[in-house]
């Protein structure tokens, strides 16, 4: 224990020597926030959970620190510990100083005075931060008055209008009387940012502030966050899993794994010279939205360790391709990779990585080319497996009040047409409300549509005469959802989950047993695990099992509704590779709905862009991404965050407004 404490002390002293010069580009003077040897553990029934283990960093006013890592790496716990919002069973050690004032050890009452005034938080889900029973104006006023009780009513109202204007809410005077449910998700997040900056805080902590938003709304929220920072001069800590977001907004980056920082650098240094094998793996797993896909993605094998049972030595060693015997025994310390830039890395093989100028291509297995998709048979000469013609779907618009009356109709899908050939992947993209999920639902239901036609494997579903025919067709058209638990019964072992669709097709036990073994092998899950329950698998493994269930009846078409949206980037890469392998082997066709446009470019052959229920652009994926013709498509593609800070700084983002393209910077709110 004494040796461990001495090692921690040495690390803190070494870190302070490096950080005393500040990261590259940091302003002179003392940091606003100084964190030393931060440790957070939780007492649970499963034992002690070490969620944060010896984190150190400094942050200056006007600068942004991005904290990245997989789920369970300790990012959010680190953020919550800074603002004193951890659960009662948390034990916190170390030091967190706000302009020299120690925050750890303060009472709840003392921290309440700081929260919202000197340090603020923006959460992932704005509804968790907004009270549905109170108007937006009331909630803004509360944020002001709780720290400024002597503010006059007129000053409060004026400041509320200023704040809504600053975050880009139109008609702020009228919007003060609105309630959270009357705002869209993006507008609610703007309001949360307005509340966070109401009292000009010195630090803003944003925990996954754009995760649930469309790419265009995400870009707008990040712009608002930048304006808020400029207005207040605050230091910003942003927690995210999206390396493209970090590249565009952060000055410095800290990569966390198993509760500890494994790499810390300026954004330029880390993206140009990632030196920790884990960081390299994260960057290798990310699809590049600005270039054509030439190689398979590089997933990181395995899963992050349980924080209740962190392995000895380097926690990443069980997954690291470079791990040696020493890596499994001794946890490495943070050491300088490029000291003049404050680039710190924890890896026993750092000297070798630095001297040989190693990249992720050297560390991870050689990149394989994408699997061939039957180049001998042109796609347009293969059979059409799914054809949609002039599809229409409307919904009634009802009046408010006790007696609901139809006031008209809203067209969710407006004469949509497309076709998918055997072995082809087609993507439907667009913002929320564009009609893509409704289109998918209409195909899924296998019922006669309100307007137009849907033809599956040459059969017009309007001509299906009975349930037997529909059941026969359904086995060839299966669905994979975003949340695998929606298709996996938590009370059933995996064997029963996979056997259920086969029993519905009246397979005998011998054939079922053989097929389940084949399915587990296909999706890369050990067949010995068939007696386990869904809760005993990781998120990525559960999605593989959901894919296996969808493949059980040998379908010709898979409908994929955001199948990787809830997964870490390293796990996403494995699922994408799996889908590509299955398509090459089985000649299966995919209709892929997703909001991640980088993934779409990597996996799809054709893409249809939807806006307000209509397809506004449709064609070969590379043609659409390289030479977009429709203004809406151009705006959509310009909003994709690219995991390269050099490119992100020089890009010009466009906004589609009133039927035309407008430079995003012209719409940014400015200092009042």
Question: What annotation goes with each model-predicted range?
Answer:
Residues 70, 84-85, 205-209, 213-295, ...:
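P-loop NTP-binding/switch modules centered on Walker-like glycine-rich loops
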Residues 116, 181, 199, 475, ...:
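Conserved signature/switch motifs of ABC ATPase nucleotide-binding domains
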Residues 89, 103-120, 146, 269-274, ...:
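ABC ATPase NBD coupling module
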Residues 91-102, 452-463:
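Conserved ABC transporter NBD signature motif
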Residues 18-21, 26-31, 45, 267-384, ...:
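Charged, flexible cofactor/metal-binding loops and thiol motifs
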Residues 83-84, 444:
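Helix-to-loop junction immediately C-terminal to a conserved catalytic motif
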Residues 155-174, 283, 460, 510-528, ...:
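Conserved ABC ATPase "signature" region
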């Amino acid at each position: 224990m004494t040796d461990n404490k001495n090692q921690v002390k040495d690390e803190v002293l070494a870190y302070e020597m490096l950080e005393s010069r500040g990261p590259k580009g940091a302003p002179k003077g003392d940091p606003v926030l100084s964190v030393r040897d931060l440790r957070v553990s939780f007492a649970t029934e499963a034992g002690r959970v070490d969620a944060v283990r010896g984190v150190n960093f400094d942050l200056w006013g006007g600068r942004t620190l991005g904290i990245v890592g997989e789920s369970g790496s300790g990012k959010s716990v680190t953020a919550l510990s800074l603002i004193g919002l951890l659960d009662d069973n948390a034990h916190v050690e170390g030091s967190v100083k706000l302009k020299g004032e120690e925050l750890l050890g303060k009472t709840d009452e003392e921290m309440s005075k700081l929260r919202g005034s000197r340090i603020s938080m923006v959460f992932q889900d704005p509804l968790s931060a907004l009270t549905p029973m109170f108007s937006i104006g009331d909630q803004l006023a509360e944020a002001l008055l709780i720290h400024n009780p002597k503010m006059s009513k007129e000053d409060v109202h004026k400041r509320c209008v200023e704040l809504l204007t600053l975050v880009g809410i139109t008609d702020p005077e009228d919007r003060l009387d609105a309630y959270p449910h009357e705002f869209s998700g993006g507008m609610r997040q703007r309001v949360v940012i307005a509340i966070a900056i109401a009292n000009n805080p010195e630090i803003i902590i944003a925990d996954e502030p754009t995760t649930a938003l469309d790419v265009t709304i995400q870009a707008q929220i990040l712009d608002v966050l930048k304006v808020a920072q400029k207005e207040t001069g605050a230091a910003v800590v942003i927690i995210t899993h999206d390396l493209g977001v970090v590249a565009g907004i952060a000055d410095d980056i800290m990569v966390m794994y198993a509760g500890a920082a494994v790499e810390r650098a300026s954004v330029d240094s880390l993206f140009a010279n990632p030196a920790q094998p884990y960081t390299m793996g994260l960057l290798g797993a990310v699809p590049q939205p600005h270039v054509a896909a030439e190689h398979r993605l590089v997933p990181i094998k395995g899963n992050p360790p349980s924080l209740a049972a962190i392995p000895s030595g380097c926690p990443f060693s069980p997954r690291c391709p470079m791990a040696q015997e020493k890596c499994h025994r001794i946890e490495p310390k943070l050491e300088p990779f490029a000291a003049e830039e404050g680039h710190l890395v924890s890896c026993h093989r750092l000297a070798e990585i630095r001297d040989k100028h190693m990249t992720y291509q050297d560390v991870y297995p050689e990149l394989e080319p994408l699997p061939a998709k039957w180049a001998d048979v042109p796609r347009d000469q293969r059979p059409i497996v799914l054809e949609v013609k002039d599809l229409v779907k409307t919904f009634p618009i009802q009046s408010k009040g006790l007696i609901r009356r139809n006031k008209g109709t809203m067209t969710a899908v407006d004469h949509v047409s497309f076709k998918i050939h055997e072995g082809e992947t087609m993507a439907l993209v667009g913002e929320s409300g564009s009609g893509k999920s409704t289109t998918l639902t209409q195909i899924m239901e296998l019922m006669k549509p309100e307007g137009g036609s849907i033809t599956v494997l040459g059969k017009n579903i309007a001509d299906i005469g009975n349930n037997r025919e529909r059941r026969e067709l359904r086995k060839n058209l299966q669905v994979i959802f975003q949340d695998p638990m929606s298709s996996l019964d938590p009370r059933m072992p995996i064997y029963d989950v996979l056997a259920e669709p086969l029993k519905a097709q009246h397979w005998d036990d011998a054939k079922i047993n053989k097929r389940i073994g084949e399915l587990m092998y296909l999706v890369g899950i050990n067949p010995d695990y068939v007696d386990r329950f869904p809760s005993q698998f990781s998120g990525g493994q559960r999605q593989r099992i959901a894919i296996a269930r969808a493949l059980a009846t040998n379908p010709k078409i898979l409908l994929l509704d955001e199948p990787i949206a809830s997964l870490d980037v390293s796990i996403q890469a494995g699922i994408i590779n799996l889908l590509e392998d299955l398509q090459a082997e089985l000649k299966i066709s995919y209709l892929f709905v997703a909001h991640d446009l980088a993934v779409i470019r990597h996996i799809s052959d054709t893409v249809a862009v939807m806006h307000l229920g209509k397809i506004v652009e449709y064609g070969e994926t590379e043609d659409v991404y390289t030479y977009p013709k429709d203004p809406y498509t151009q705006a959509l593609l310009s909003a994709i965050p690219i995991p390269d800070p050099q490119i992100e700084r020089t890009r010009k983002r466009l906004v589609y407004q009133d039927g035309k393209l407008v430079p995003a910077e012209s719409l940014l709110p400015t200092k009042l």
